């Protein structure tokens, strides 16, 4: 999976960066939100918990997707601004199996 940033804009009022990116997934399936969040966080030197993938659309007949992401300065600000269902989609916790 490769990520190409199409546009990036700073939003000082909401204390976030708004990014449109192209996700090139080659022969494999469409990548998960989690993998896109982790990769974008690594590229932009941010924590994965501060990155929100708002939407991700696969293009028909092409092996790429267009994603809209936001990187917040703090988790508190993210929870104030984003809708609860979007935050829930982007919070990835490790589930422990009961043994």
Curated annotation (Swiss-Prot):
Q: Which UniProt keywords apply?
A: Ribonucleoprotein, Ribosomal protein
GO terms under biological process: translation
- Which GO MF terms does the UniProt record name? structural constituent of ribosome
Q: Has keyword Oxidoreductase?
A: no
| Pfam families on file | Ribosomal_S24e
Q: Does the keyword Ribonucleoprotein apply?
A: yes
Record-level GO cellular component terms? ribonucleoprotein complex; ribosome
What family is this?
Belongs to the eukaryotic ribosomal protein eS24 family.
What HAMAP family does this protein's entry cite?
Ribosomal_eS24 (MF_00545)
This chain's protein is named Small ribosomal subunit protein eS24
Instruction: Tell me what organism the protein belongs to.
Output: Methanothrix thermoacetophila (strain DSM 6194 / JCM 14653 / NBRC 101360 / PT) (Methanosaeta thermophila)
Q: What is the lineage of its organism?
A: Archaea, Methanobacteriati, Methanobacteriota, Stenosarchaea group, Methanomicrobia
Q: Which gene encodes it?
A: rps24e
């Amino acid at each position: 999976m490769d990520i190409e940033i199409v546009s990036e804009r700073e939003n000082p009022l909401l204390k976030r960066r708004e990014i449109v990116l192209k996700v090139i997934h080659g022969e494999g399936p469409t990548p998960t939100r989690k993998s896109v969040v982790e990769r974008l966080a690594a590229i932009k030197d941010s924590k994965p918990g501060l990155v929100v993938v708002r939407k991700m659309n696969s293009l028909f007949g092409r092996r790429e997707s267009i994603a809209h992401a936001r990187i917040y300065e703090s988790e508190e600000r993210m929870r104030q601004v984003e809708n609860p269902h979007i935050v829930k989609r982007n919070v990835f916790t490790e589930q422990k199996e009961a043994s």
